[in-house]
Amino acid sequence: GMGGASSPALAAAVSNAGGLGVLGAAACGPRQLREWIRQTREMTEKPFGVDTLLPASVRRANYEDNDGPTPMDLVPERQAFAEEFMRKEGLELPEPGSLQRGPDDDEPALFTKEFFEAQMEVIIQERVPVYASGLGNPGPWMTGLRANGTKVMAVVGAVRHAIQVKS
């Protein structure tokens, strides 16, 4: 999955063409992730995946400060590239402000422990066919993923990480 350029339409198109379409969902809150999974299912009967991050060390949310960064705050140049790519390829752009947190937003702050846990709950509840951990160890969620028949992949950068994921 290519976070920022990924969409249900792109993932479904790749799967329908015989590849494995993957939703790059690192910055998707749980509501948006559930919506994307369901939209993808409406467009394909083929297997598809979801790719998120599971960092080992991450902060807990400070619920008194609900002003965590949004995807648009993180890397503006990357977002500009993704928007240009999506326009060129005829893909639907996110609604302006759709990635901004509202004052009454009860979703976990972006890139907190609660955020990643909520994403994994959605992935398990929605019985996603393939899950890819772009960072970190999906071990704590393997029971739920296996119970669903979800195929699990983990991207690792070192032998020691592969050993951690294997166990």
Predicted segments, located by residue:
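Active-site entrance/lid segments in N-terminal catalytic domains of soluble metabolic enzymes
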Residues: 1-167
